[in-house]
Swiss-Prot record:
Superkingdom of origin organism: Eukaryota
Subunit structure and binding partners: Interacts with ARL3.
InterPro entries xref list: C20orf194-like, CobW_C_DAAF9, DAAF9_N
Biological classification of the source: Eukaryota, Metazoa, Chordata, Craniata, Vertebrata
Protein name: Dynein axonemal assembly factor 9
Role summary: May act as an effector for ARL3.
Pfam families for this protein: CobW_C_DAAF9, DAAF9, DAAF9_2, DAAF9_N
The gene coding this protein: Dnaaf9
Length: 1179
């Protein structure tokens, strides 16, 4: 399985829609860092880790489930039906334990849910899988013991553990004894496999729910996408229902009550609040619909709208009991941050042009002035939002909003009321978290919250002084918006913010009106009828039809869909709410037409109008640029009819002197390009196949600025680490502005090859250098071996400085040639995080070095047999070495002949989940066989590509300035270099290496030796041999060191110049001790003979006594003894098996043996012997 398909696994694809596309890994890692930040807060009692246990093992604790869903994008929000589709029980899929530490994560799972979890977690930094293989998992008893032992291992290094005890809105009193009753926690106390004691007695537990709730409440790209595709869709549906109420009641609109009109908002909010557990009651976060003069300050500030009025109708809420001229409405998401308010009108704000210049009726004039105030309020709120997004200052935003409002009230009729209106204006910006709770705007996390900007002009008087001079009511407008900020570092080192914002509720119509008076309705109908007559002021009807969209650059208006009728002398646009809009040629300066010379491009008729048309144009179409755009969508009937019936006649100049002028894209102004782009997005969204609300196309069509904002927000939401100015354009994915990256000829390209010990990286590098000298002169950097660190940044930086100095010391002509041809190969075999190598170059103190070298590509070598310590527990940094954004190529150095080998496939799936863009290369033992693979490894610009650069900024915030913390190595792998002089015994050394594998211990792996490498001499040869032993594969290679030019001396890597030993071995393993390694190595050398101890009679063996008897039994007998052939007989007839003088014989034997021992010991003492680790005496 090389890629993840949720449908193949039986999970609902809706959960994955858009989640694991571009940037999903960065959001996942960002969320993990947010959770880990709880562990790094300055507190004396901060926990060492956060424990999250799912399923039955935590008695289905909701707090743990909520944390898992936050980190895994709602994976455990699946319903029972989704889990049944997988074919596995919920208990198996819930079998997950997470321990989150400040720089690492431990994850227990089983082989079944491992593949479900992998796409979500593979890119986490320092991830440790505690998972059995499929075969091991078949033994249920062993599987249960493994889970308990894994749990014990996870928490071994902790003293205080945080528990996400409660879910949001369901705060429970933390009870550690309830935690003690969780099944897996109870199992901790089991003897033998448990942790030797009760969990709650061994560890200090604390509830971290409140801290995590703050984390969950922040907006990030994933929660934004979820809000746009789900919450905003439901939110917009309420407004659709709201408009449907009015459209249905048009014949009886005057009898509509506030209660009827506001029912969709009230039901939506009330039902949602029942399950939201939000107790705050703020008037800014409650829905309302108020007609006419009922929308007073007192009613808007009542704090509760649970009891709407049935008696306030459109008919009776105007001045002096007349019909209302407008209404104010607000819809609020009960469990989310969305809210917006609008002011809509009952009556027309314009009079259709019928060839005369009749004065506006009094009612229309009143509504027109009210709508002008509302238009100024809209511009003020939008200006305030723009100012706040740029400055993050409420005071400045308020100042700008109020100034914009005052500038908008320029009409002579409003002059007497300016001072009075100014005193009745309020402007607020509220920050709202993801649960719909208002939070302080100066909160340090408020940047990541949705905000609502609202302006209200309270209690507007009767502007024309009629009707007894009563109050018309209030005007309200608000929008929910989200800001994004990227800190940009300039060349001079200064930091400047780059901001962006998106108005989330912009798709809700900002302006709407319904015709309620009979005179207005009749006038609209009269206009339509007049166009059909011969004496129409617009001339002859050419064609007409539905499906046209009218655009204006006014902030109040969006695309208005209606019917367009084209005449020889102008056009008429009919809208269901606004009535008829007549645009005669006498009010037009020019007609322009743009269609991009393509049948797939929206055709745009640009109408540049004169100010004389303003009384005949709805207020929200009054734009600062005095133009309208009529969009005709390709393949529509009106589109085809325009070309066949209108295009040619309009191109001919008539009495008005106007003719249709066809323009190209360069003839469009910036504002016209923006509107046309918006129309094109809307056409794309509405084109078949039909899109649902959550589709990116439709979202982009409704919110045209969304794509641009999402690119910005993806970077801005990661953190507050600055971005280099030169990188910003590429990060925001603006390819038309991003120049293709080419490596400058005077730079030295660095090719980095890394991997775990035993991965054959050195062989790959030797192969590259030997066979590919045409790439130029090679410099090779290898890590120093006599260091406890796998990678020493200071040493690497020193090497780079030396390399630059060596190049600069050459002659100018030679330097130019060599500089162009020189490449640096960096070979690192160890538990090194590649990002540390990158940061070492980026943070080099010499700017000349930083500019002289550039990284071409990073390649990691993977030996499948050397990846797992046990089960599926990876060696430290194994997965981190394959990180997206840094590594371009992954070279598999074994099992390449059998490409379907289960181990190879399993690792490829794991690495592909971690790095979807890496190229996979098969190279047995480091030997690459394809030229295209070599090109990938030696690429000069792979590392610097825009995609890689963007991934680095997203996954490694702060990397460019060396501020990204790669985390510690766990389990701690020790690298100990042992120097010696004496040759080793080859046979003993080989046998001892082979025996290491059988002594490997399970977790916590203390004392395990995994790799041995170095240079030694054996007693059977004078040659220096290079040895390399891999414990897991039990492979040992011994090859002569190739003779060649000696590298420059280095005090660290060439100790023989200082009289130190010339042989060394590097031991790599867990918790190794140098003394133990020396003792092990001594057993591989020629053993020093031991002094022999003197013998005594009591030490003689039976065999020795027998030998003495055989040798001396025929010696002369003392008087009174004779030998009968089998026994010795004395004078009294006593018989014995030994010679009567046997005691003397034994004493003689002991004396003789001791003389030999003493001679041997004297000779031994005269021999010169040095311990393996003694230094040679100086000559």
């Amino acid at each position: 399985m090389d890629s993840f398909d949720p449908q193949q696994l039986g999970l609902s694809p809706a959960r994955f829609a858009g989640t694991f596309g571009s940037g999903a890994a960065s959001v996942s890692c960002s969320r993990l860092r947010q959770v880990q930040s709880v562990l790094t807060q300055s507190s004396k009692s901060q926990p060492d880790g956060i424990l999250c246990i799912l399923g039955i093992d935590s008695r289905y604790n909701e707090g743990c489930r909520e944390l898992a869903n936050y980190l895994l994008f709602g994976l455990y929000s699946q319903n029972a039906t989704d889990f049944e589709k997988t074919g596995f029980s919920e208990e198996i899929l819930d079998d997950v334990i997470l321990l989150i530490k400040s720089d690492s994560v431990h994850l227990y799972c089983n082989p079944v849910n491992y593949r479900y979890l992998l796409p979500y977690v593979a890119h986490w930094r320092n991830l440790h899988f505690h998972c059995m293989t499929e075969n091991e998992y078949e033994d249920e008893e062993a599987a249960e013991e493994f889970k308990i032992s894994s749990f014990v291992d996870m928490v071994r290094d902790c003293s205080r553990i945080g528990i996400p005890y409660s879910s949001q809105g369901h705060l429970q009193i933390f009870d550690m004894f309830v935690v003690e009753k969780w099944p897996i926690v109870q199992a901790f106390a089991l003897e033998g496999i448990g942790g030797d004691g009760f969990f709650t007695m061994k560890y200090e537990l604390q509830d971290v729910s409140l801290s995590l709730w703050n984390v969950y409440s922040r907006m990030d790209p994933a929660s934004l996408e979820n809000m746009l595709s789900e919450d905003l869709a439901v939110f917009e549906h309420q407004w659709t229902s709201f408009f449907a109420n009015f459209d249905t009641e048009i014949p009886f609109l005057l009898e509509l009550s506030e209660s009827q009109a506001g029912e969709p908002f009230r039901s939506y909010f009330g039902h949602g609040m029942l399950s939201s557990h939000i107790t705050e009651n703020s008037p800014h976060r409650q829905p309302f619909v108020l007609f006419g003069n009922h929308s007073t300050r007192d009613n808007l500030s009542a704090g509760s709208f649970n009891f709407p009025s049935e008696g306030h109708l459109v008919r009776n809420t105007g001045p002096a009991g007349s019909f209302a001229k407008h209404m104010v409405a607000q819809c609020v998401s009960p469990k989310g941050p969305l809210a917006c308010s609008r002011t809509y009108f009952f009556g027309a704000t314009h009079v259709p042009y019928l060839g005369d210049n009749e004065k506006l009726p009094r009612t229309t004039e009143q509504i027109r002035l009210l709508s002008q105030i509302y238009a100024a309020v809209i511009e003020a709120v939008l200006a305030g939002i723009a100012c706040y997004a740029k400055t993050c200052s409420l005071a400045k935003a308020k100042e700008v909003a109020e100034h914009t409002l005052e500038s908008g009230l320029v009409f002579t009729e409003l002059v007497p009321f300016k001072a009075d209106l100014r005193s009745k204006v309020t402007f607020h910006i509220h920050a709202v978290n993801n649960q719909g709770r208002i939070v302080p705007l100066n909160n340090e996390d408020s940047l990541s919250f949705v905000k609502t900007a609202r302006m209200t002009v309270y209690d507007i008087p009767d502007l024309l002084g009629g009707g007894g001079g009563g109050c018309l009511g209030s005007v309200v407008f608000s929008e929910s918006f989200l800001t994004s900020r990227i800190l940009v570092k300039e060349k001079d080192g200064t930091i400047t913010p780059e901001t962006s914002y998106i108005i989330l509720t912009a798709a809700i119509p900002r302006f709407c009106s319904w015709l309620v008076e009979d005179s207005e309705i009749k006038l609209s109908e009269k206009t339509l009828q007049a166009t059909k007559g011969d004496d129409c002021c617009l001339g002859t009807l050419l064609t007409g039809g539905k499906g046209a969209y009218l655009y204006s650059n006014s902030p109040q208006s969006g695309p208005e869909e209606g019917s367009a009728y084209f005449f020889s002398g102008g056009l008429l646009f009919s809208h269901r709410h606004h009535g008829s809009i007549v645009i005669a040629k006498e009010h037009v300066d020019a007609f322009s037409f743009y269609d991009g010379d393509s049948t797939s491009v929206v055709a745009a008729l640009l109408i540049h109008f004169r100010s004389s048309i303003l009384p005949h144009l709805p207020v929200h179409f009054h734009g600062s640029s005095n133009f309208l755009m009529l969009a005709l969508f390709p393949k529509s009937k009106i589109y085809q009819a325009f070309y066949s019936e209108v295009f040619s006649p309009w191109q001919q100049q008539d009495n008005s002197g106007l003719s249709l002028k066809v323009i190209q894209e360069d003839g469009l102004s910036a504002e016209q390009k923006r509107l046309h782009s918006n129309a094109q997005k809307l056409f794309s969204a509405l084109s078949p196949p039909a899109q649902d609300w959550s589709s990116p196309k439709l979202l982009s069509g409704k919110l045209p600025e969304l794509d641009r904002f999402l690119q910005h927000f993806a970077i801005g939401s990661i953190g507050q680490e600055p971005v280099m100015r030169a990188h910003l354009v590429g990060l925001l994915q603006q390819p038309e502005m991003s120049p293709a990256h080419e490596v400058e000829s005077d730079k030295v390209v660095i090719s980095i090859v890394t991997g775990l010990p035993g991965c054959h990286a050195s062989k790959l590098c030797a192969f590259l250098i030997t066979l590919h000298k045409e790439y130029g002169r090679w410099m090779v950097y290898r890590q120093i071996m006599d260091s406890s660190e796998c990678f020493h940044a200071a040493h690497f930086q020193k090497y780079l400085s030396s390399a630059l100095e060596a190049q600069q010391n050459r002659s100018a002509r030679q330097s130019a040639y060599i500089r162009k041809k020189t490449r640096l190969l960096v070979v690192l075999q160890g538990y090194t995080d590649v990002i540390d190598v990158v940061q070492a170059l980026q943070t080099h103190p010499d700017p000349n070095v930083r500019s002289y070298f550039t990284i071409g590509a990073v390649t990691v070598c993977v030996e499948p047999l050397s990846c797992y310590m046990e089960h599926r527990f990876l060696f430290p940094k194994c997965l981190d070495q394959c990180s997206q954004g840094v590594v371009s190529n992954v070279v598999f150095t074994s099992h390449t002949a059998e490409q379907k080998h289960p181990l190879l496939v399993q690792l490829q799936t794991l690495i592909r989940a971690s790095n979807p863009t890496a190229a996979f290369i098969l190279a047995e033992n480091g030997i690459v066989t394809r030229n295209e693979d070599i090109e990938l490894i030696l690429s000069e610009n792979s590392f610097s590509s825009p995609q890689m650069l963007r991934s680095r900024y997203l996954l490694f915030p702060g990397w460019y300035e060396g501020k990204f913390d790669a985390g510690s190595v766990f389990p701690l792998m020790v690298q100990i270099c042992v120097w010696f002089d004496c040759p080793l015994e080859k046979t003993r050394f080989v046998s001892r290496c082979r025996a290491i594998q059988s002594s490997i211990k399970p977790s916590p792996f203390s004392g395990n030796i995994y790799h041995i490498l170095g240079k030694v001499k054996f007693s059977d040869s004078e040659k220096t041999m290079e040895v390399c032993h891999n414990t897991l594969t039990n492979s040992l290679t011994i090859v002569p060191v190739l003779e060649g030019p000696t590298p420059p001396p280095n005090s660290r890597s060439s100790p023989q110049d200082n009289g130190q030993p010339e042989c060394y071995l590097v031991f790599i393993g867990c918790s190794l001790k140098e003394d133990s390694l020396k003792d092990w190595l001594r057993q591989s050398a020629k053993q020093r003979p031991q002094r022999k101890a003197l013998k005594t009679r009591g030490m003689l063996t039976q065999q020795e006594i027998k030998n003495i008897h055989v040798k001396r039994h025929l010696d002369p007998l003392p008087a009174g003894y004779f030998y009968n052939g089998t026994q010795f007989v004395n004078f009294f007839g006593d018989k014995t098996d030994f010679h009567p003088l046997m005691d003397q014989f034994m004493n003689d034997y002991v004396e003789e043996a001791n003389r030999e021992i003493e001679r041997y010991n004297r000779e031994l003492e005269q021999q010169e012997y040095r311990d393996l680790f003694e230094q040679k005496p100086k000559p």
